[in-house]
From Swiss-Prot:
Similarity-based family: Belongs to the SHANK family.
Lipid metabolism among keywords: no
Compositional bias per record (Basic residues), positions renumbered to this chain: 351-364
Record field: compositional bias (Low complexity): 388-412, 761-775, 784-793, 1015-1028
Domain (PDZ) ranges: 436-529
Biological source species: Caenorhabditis elegans
Keyword tRNA-binding in annotation: no
ANK repeat spans: 144-174, 178-207, 211-242, 246-275, 279-309, 312-341
Domain (SAM) ranges: 1078-1140
Pfam family, one: PDZ
Major site of localization recorded for this protein: other
Disulfide bonding pattern of the chain: none
Name under which the protein is recorded: Protein shank
General remark: In contrast to the mammalian Shank proteins, does not contain a SH3 domain.
The encoding gene: shn-1
């Protein structure tokens, strides 16, 4: 059955809110999941929402009824084109024809209801049946929050009353005020007769309470539990592998309470013998802690791993000695793994229950699927439960879908389970065989966590092997998501995305491919057989995390991957003298931060396919479109676009002191903030090898736009290859790069021009590179020979300040034979600059672009920024109309070279049409474009900066939005609200009357440095960064306090309700104070630097200053709203670092 036939459009009406909703669900969706999806979309929360049910009104002579929550949509055939349901509070459905409303009202007084509860308590079956026959509705709560059915289920051997209640209209799944059903109550109290009666009357063994626990789990919570209750629940196909908020399974609780027979039943019906909780403790560890030698003996006899270690590196034997339980230690020491006898038979289930699509035959996989040799692992259930995530802040996590490879049996999936997956699942689900999965996008995304090597900037000597077939793998899979239904399992390696080979791609590239997918995504994955996997050099067994505690995850070691902390464009280059030093992986805390609050994986698609693009994005796009065609000329260094757009950065610091320490270790020369940065490292083609990694795809490189990570001012870009090594296709592709994780911006107005001509002969390589670094200077006709002789020993001269002209003029650079020219050649290189003397001013650009006072020196210092004196000397040319701009471009081209070809003119004209004036607003998206050469005054100096008195504003760059077009989050489940995003943003202003100055200087470093995810790309650049001098030519550095930083707002307000300037000031001030003297604003700024701005309202309302912050403990942080352990640990760790 195809996807369209499986989809059902439901029309659901909510009478309490007078709301009508339309939901598209599949035939295999459980009623419980449909109800939860509906409750999440309601504008107002309903009280006791767990007691609301989907009601099917009477139709075609059939009485209305509430749909059972443990069944699927397929079990309820609908006759209408658009099935109609109602979400109503569960009440008795009367089938009597002669109803007297007055009599019913008299039956439901407080006195009558109290009397009815007394009859239930006294087991007076006749009275209960009589009152129900008179029309009393048994679906109500007493003063203690109990229902008549839950009260009756708690009384031993109360079969008659239970039958009378359910026969009298009581819903079997009606919950008490704590969200527990009668089945939960009977299982907890080990009332075997009551559990049996409820099951016979149609109750499900898989009801969930608000935290997702089942009756089977409840049965393991007491030491005097009856094993017959567990057995009958398991025979009715109860879910196994349900965990609480601490990650404890049923078998953990059974071992804790010494329930030996329960452990036997759980193992026989497929329980995971070596399941781990959040601390990494297996059931054997629990036996060691609680001194349960009998349970430990059963576990070892059935194949438990006695060498399994927890997250503290302790085995069960270690734990038993530490706690002081010699009984368990003796059992473990005396155990011989060869004597283990695991269960190998298939369990028998009850034939009375209809095992249809409602309850899948999840134990169809043979129970002989046990791990090889002395490590035995019982197989997991293939069945996906209907309610793996409960509507509570502490959702349950089910691990029963993890499949362990085996040498004894072949893993098989039942046909019904394959139907429920909804995707193309390979028959048999064998290991080491690639399979194709088609995963539809659900409400929470696709439902997986991707993990692997990040930011591959250099070519990898990685060849896929049988053990490590790809760089990216799936760390976790949402047990209630679409991926697990399609057959995806934790630990699977990703081979292809929509037919594109991604085995050697970095994490960012793969994320972009996933984000570009539509409503469905086709993945080619493979499950690696753990038993055949080598434990040596190429595989690392990563410790289990909260999202994949029960799956073996293997990762390529750093030795197999080059250092990949800097993003490349299309090419990836490798220097022969460089060594690989490691690779970055997504840590669990980074994954949680990146995906907000949720623990299930998803890659969200930004709403709206045709979203507007911000000015900063256009600026960076135009900068990247400046692809050099001159042989040997370097690429211009790209702007920190991801930081400007407020995109998430994967590099985090544990504390402010850690940030400062690590920044100090990487203290390299910084390029002038906001200026067009160029690299001066010249690598000869003979000493470097450039490799290009282009994935095969059916269309030319248009869809692939590599993401860029933030470049710190102190990082150096690896030298890009000469243009002679770059094919025209690659050059075109490099102009299409982007830096967002969101839906890619696909420009439709891209000028359709032929590729640039092949470069001329390799001559004057050094001079060409110098001219490309200064595109505003026309090419000299001849270059003095001593320049090339001195290049090896004398540093190249510093670049001049960029011409701050307002018109988007284009400078044409061409290779021409040496001839006489009136344009003066560039001056010879300057001698080395001493530490105390400033360098001489650089050569001026041609006249007409800008005017610099001859007396204004270019200051240099040890900090970053632009000096005020340098800014005073800048005189800007006034803006000209668009026609004048186009004419000037044409005139310049004609003056430079008369032999310009037609396609070059077309290219320049097309590019000129895409650019607008800096200080004029024109129509919406087409006209909101900016300079392409990195010389825009939005990045350096605004127009008419001499009148800075009315332009400079002390506005911080923190908490600024980019008109809502910031980078998407690379989340499990990212937050939908843009208003709650407190991460730094940067935007550009197009107002024609505002004159401002932007210095992306030390403040940017302080703010975005905490999110720095870049490091030196190779060993050579790392070594050079430690010896470079801050007075190196080509870098303008002045104290950051000369001119206060401002930013350009697209939005008048950040939307947070707080003053951005106050937050900025607080971030500056708290770093120079002791914690004891911190004010409330200092604490708020400190929290913002830790990316924990969501707690600032509570800290501000409680007036938490530095002294109070030092006295905060766990309970105090909880009162302030810091309930997440990871966030509290970040705060405490950072605070300890400051105090030390």
């Amino acid at each position: 059955m195809n996807q369209e036939e499986d989809t059902v459009n439901l029309q659901i009406f909510v009478p309490e809110l007078n709301v009508r909703k339309f939901l598209a669900v599949t035939q295999n969706d459980f009623i419980w999941d449909v109800k939860r999806k509906l409750l999440a979309t309601l504008p107002q929360a309903l009280p006791q929402a767990f007691n609301y049910g989907l009601f099917l009104p009477p139709c075609d002579g059939r009485a209305g009824k509430f749909l059972l929550e443990d069944r699927t949509i397929r079990d309820y055939p609908f006759t209408d084109c658009v099935p109609y349901l109602e979400l109503k509070y569960k009440k008795r459905v009367y089938k009597m024809l002669n109803l007297d409303e007055k009599q019913l009202k008299a039956m439901h007084t407080k006195g009558q209801l109290k009397k009815f509860m007394d009859y239930v308590q006294q087991k007076n079956n006749e009275k209960v049946e009589k009152m129900c026959s008179q029309g009393l509705d048994a679906n109500f709560h007493d003063a203690q929050g109990e229902t008549p059915l839950t009260l009756a289920a708690g009384i031993p051997n109360n079969r008659a009353v239970i039958v009378s209640l359910i026969g009298g209209g009581a819903h079997v799944d009606f919950r008490n005020s704590e969200g527990q059903t009668a089945m939960h109550k009977a299982a907890f109290l080990s009332s075997f007769e009551n559990v049996k009666t409820l099951i016979e009357l149609g109750a499900s063994p898989n009801y969930r309470d608000p935290i997702g626990l089942t009756p089977l789990y409840y049965n393991m919570l007491t030491a005097d539990s009856n094993d017959q209750v567990a057995e009958i629940l398991l025979r009715e196909a109860a879910d196994i592998g349900v965990t609480d908020m601490h990650g404890n399974h049923e078998i953990h609780q059974a071992c804790k309470n010494g329930l030996t027979k329960h452990v036997e039943h759980l193992l026989y019906f497929g329980g995971q013998i070596d399941a781990e909780n959040v601390n990494g403790n297996s059931p054997l560890h629990v036996c060691a802690v609680n001194n349960r030698p009998e349970c430990a003996r059963v576990l070892l006899f059935r194949g438990a791993d006695h060498l399994a270690v927890n997250k503290q590196g302790q085995t069960a034997l270690h734990v038993s000695h530490i706690v002081g339980n010699p009984g368990v230690a003796d059992v473990v020491q005396a155990h011989n793994p060869k004597s283990s006898v695991p269960y190998r038979g298939t369990p028998q289930y009850s034939t009375r229950r209809r095992l249809s699509s409602t309850i899948t035959r999840r134990r169809s996989m043979s129970q002989s699927s046990i791990c090889s040799q002395d490590v035995y692992r019982t197989p997991q259930s293939v069945r996906k439960g209907p309610m793996s995530a409960a509507p509570s802040p502490s959702p349950s996590r089910s691990s029963r879908t993890t499949i362990t490879p085996s040498e004894y049996g072949t893993m098989r999936r039942s046909g019904m389970d394959s139907m429920r997956g909804g995707g193309m699942i390979a028959a048999g689900h064998e290991t080491n065989i690639a399979r194709i999965l088609v995963i539809p996008r659900g409400v929470k995304g696709f439902g997986f966590i991707l993990r692997g090597a990040k930011h591959v900037a250099m070519p990898l000597n990685f060849e896929p092997t049988a053990q490590v077939p790809a760089l990216q793998f799936f760390e976790g899979v949402d047990m209630s998501g679409m991926a697990v239904r399609a057959g995806l399992r934790p630990g699977d390696y990703l081979l292809e995305i929509d037919g594109i080979d991604v085995r050697r791609c970095s994490h960012d590239e793969v994320v972009e491919f996933i984000q570009q997918a539509g409503d469905t995504i086709t993945l080619k994955v493979i499950t690696v057989d753990v038993a055949d996997m080598s434990r040596g050099g190429t595989i690392v067994h990563r410790p289990p995390t909260a999202s994949s505690r029960h799956s073996l995850v293997f990762t390529p070691t750093p030795s197999a991957i080059y250092s990949s902390t800097k993003a490349s464009s299309v090419y990836r280059m490798r220097f022969d003298t460089h060594d690989a030093h490691g690779v970055d992986y997504y840590a669990p805390n980074e994954i949680r931060n990146a995906y907000s609050e949720s623990r299930h994986a998803s890659v969200r698609q930004r709403p709206g396919s045709g979203r507007r693009i911000s000015a900063a994005e256009l600026e960076n796009l135009m900068v990247r479109q400046r692809v050099p065609s001159v042989q040997g000329s370097p690429y211009q260094m790209q702007y920190d676009q991801e930081s400007l757009n407020g995109g998430y950065s994967s590099k985090k610091y544990n504390s402010v002191s850690d940030m400062k320490r690590r920044k100090g270790q990487r203290n390299v020369v910084a390029s002038s903030a906001g200026l067009n940065r160029s690299t001066f490292e010249q690598a000869a083609p003979t000493t470097s090898t450039f490799e290009y990694n282009c994935s095969s795809r059916s269309t030319p490189q248009l869809s692939r736009m590599d993401s860029f990570d933030s470049f710190d001012d102190e990082d150096e870009m690896p030298a890009p290859p000469p243009a002679s090594y770059i094919s025209p296709d690659l050059q075109r592709d490099s102009s299409m790069q982007r830096s967002e994780y969101s839906r890619p911006f696909r420009p439709t107005s891209r000028p359709k021009t032929p590729p640039p001509p092949p470069p001329m002969q390799h001559q004057n390589h050094q001079n060409h590179q110098y001219q490309q670094q200064h595109p505003s200077l026309p090419r000299s006709a001849s270059t003095p020979q001593p320049i090339q002789q001195q290049q090896s020993s004398i540093p190249p001269p510093p670049p001049p300040p960029p011409p701050p002209h307002c018109e988007p003029t284009m400078v044409h650079v061409e290779f021409t034979p040496p001839s006489t020219s009136s344009v003066p050649p560039p001056p010879p290189p300057l001698p080395p600059i001493s530490s105390g003397a400033p360098p001489p001013p650089p050569p001026p650009p041609p006249g007409g672009l800008m005017h610099v006072a001859a007396s204004a020196p270019v200051l240099m210092s040890n900090s970053k920024g632009i000096s005020a004196d340098a800014l005073k000397s800048v005189q800007l040319k006034k803006a000209e109309p668009r026609e004048t701009s186009a004419a000037s471009v044409s005139n310049n081209n004609n003056n430079n070279n008369n032999s310009t070809t037609d396609f070059q003119m077309d290219l320049k004209n097309a590019l000129a049409k895409r650019r607008s004036k800096v200080a004029h607003d024109v129509d919406e998206d087409e006209e909101r474009e900016s300079r392409f050469e990195g010389l825009s005054l939005r990045e350096t100096v605004r127009e008419n900066v001499v009148e800075r008195g009315k332009g400079i504003q002390n506005i911080g760059i923190v908490n600024k939005k980019d008109s809502g077009y910031t980078s998407s989050r690379t989340s499990l489940e990212p937050s939908e609200s843009e208003e709650k995003d407190h991460r730094p943003h940067f935007s550009l202003d197009h107002s024609p009357n505002v004159q401002r100055v932007t210095l992306i200087s030390q403040h940017l470093e302080d703010n975005y440095g905490q999110k720095d995810n870049m490091s030196v790309a190779s060993s050579s650049t790392a070594s050079s960064s430690s010896t470079v001098d801050l007075t190196k030519p080509g870098c303008f550095v002045v104290p950051s306090h000369v001119i206060p930083p401002v930013d350009y707002d697209d939005d008048p307000d950040s939307g947070t309700g707080d003053s951005d300037g106050e937050i900025r000031c607080s971030e500056i001030s708290f770093e120079h104070k002791k914690v004891d003297v911190w004010s409330v604003d200092d604490v708020i700024g400190w929290l913002s630097s830790l990316h924990l701005s969501e707690y600032t309202p509570a800290f501000r309302s409680q007036r938490i200053n530095g002294r109070c912050l030092r006295q905060c403990d766990r309970s105090r942080f909880t009162q302030l709203g810091v309930t997440r352990i990871a966030h509290r640990q970040i705060i405490e760790s950072a605070l300890r670092g400051l105090l030390q």
